Amino acid sequence: MRRNLRKLAVLGMFSMFAYTVQGQRFLTEVFPSVNVTPSVIYSQNYEVLTGTPVLKDLKMDIYEPSGAADPMTERPLIIYLHTGSYIPIIVNGNATGSRNDSAAVEICKQFARRGYVVANMDYRLGWDPTNTNPTNGLDIRRGTLLNAVYRSIQDAKACVRYFRKDAAINNNVYKIDVNNFYLVGQGTGGYIALNYAVLNSPSEITLPKFISSTDAPTYGIFAGQPYVNQAALGDFDGIGGVAPFNNENHPGYSNAVQFVVNLGGAMGDSSWIAAGDAPMIGIHCVDDPFAPYGVGIVYVPTTPPQAVVDVIGSGEIIKHANQLGNNACFANAGFTDPYTLRANSINNGNEGLFPLQQGLNPVNPQLGHAGPWEWYNLTATQNLAVAMGYLPTRGDTCYGNSLLTNPTMNKAYALAYIDTIMNYVNPRIVF
């Protein structure tokens, strides 16, 4: 899978002529403002958040460059995937977890001001992270998480197909270049983006670690069977399956994406990466407690922590991608900017990998760091908790929990990390 680099470069060059004073499109913010079309329904599918499948509208906010005439009639699309641990914000015990998060909104706006169209999409939630049943708790945690990831990949693919369908039959309302679709995943969204790019064979989800050893019929989990039941859920693209487990959306259109960026997150297994997969960039805290930077186990942060499944993080993923030649399109570009120089000083020669080293967590060195590009407000978190039926103290707890792995959190600090993301990622997409 390879993006149309020549076409993107030519389009970017024409745009640059229109904005010579301001800078080069995609590399700098050449548009003064952003137009947001909120809550566009891109698909409908069954969510199991309450335990009973419910058909739900899945929505996205679409960010477009504005404030100046746009000479491009077909613009690259970024599908943005927010964080949240597959549990709704506040319910998940944190101050983040929706497409309205400060970091998600800011990153989408910055991409749009550079000339991309950005779809900031919701996806289906729901798993059982805290099940501690001594007999089958591990299988329930692992199985329900894998099903959550699987459903979210189906949702992201439905979103991609929505835009290709719109371009084909609806006069391309958002002026999308159907040959240039990119995924950018933050935190949990990083899991979605990475696994979207590599999962394509049923055999990949029947590895021994993805087979249940116990029965949990309430969850559709049975000993000796894969956690993911494709006969019920449909295939990786969300095609097939049965109600009330899957609802097909926009069949017949391509799911192809041309580039993948993960800000944290992980991949289910290194064997899933193959030659020809989309180019990948990984930006990852080296001491991330939620998604290992290298090879490790995903844990639920309870007391004591509950193991879920072993995965690989950006440190291993980008190494494999480079070894297979998937990042050849930018691997030898010879970037000499300060962001590249910093990344290259600590990434063991793995171009496209930016390890984030922040020193010891001052609250507790064992906690590590996660999401330094995020910021949140105590009062807003309290108000959101109240709006969801909780006491304000629930907001206090969520705010405090988020600070544990982002102890120096503030807007200026977060924006500095977002600046790093933009200046590392965009030259590699455009090259």
Where are the predicted features?
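The feature captures the conserved acid-bearing segment of alpha/beta-hydrolase catalytic domains
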Residues: 215-331
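Gly/Ser-rich "nucleophile elbow"/oxyanion-hole loop immediately N-terminal to the catalytic nucleophile
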Residues: 73-74, 139-154, 158-187, 202-208, ...
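Active-site-adjacent alpha-helix of alpha/beta-hydrolase-fold enzymes
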Residues: 97-103, 112, 278-379
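Bacterial Sec-dependent N-terminal signal peptides
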Residues: 1-27
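Short beta-strand element of the alpha/beta-hydrolase
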Residues: 73-86
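N-terminal cap/lid segment of alpha/beta-hydrolase-fold proteins
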Residues: 24-76
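Glycine-rich nucleophile elbow surrounding the catalytic serine of serine-hydrolase chemistry
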Residues: 185-195
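Cap/lid segment of the alpha/beta-hydrolase catalytic domain
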Residues: 86-101, 116-150, 342, 398-403
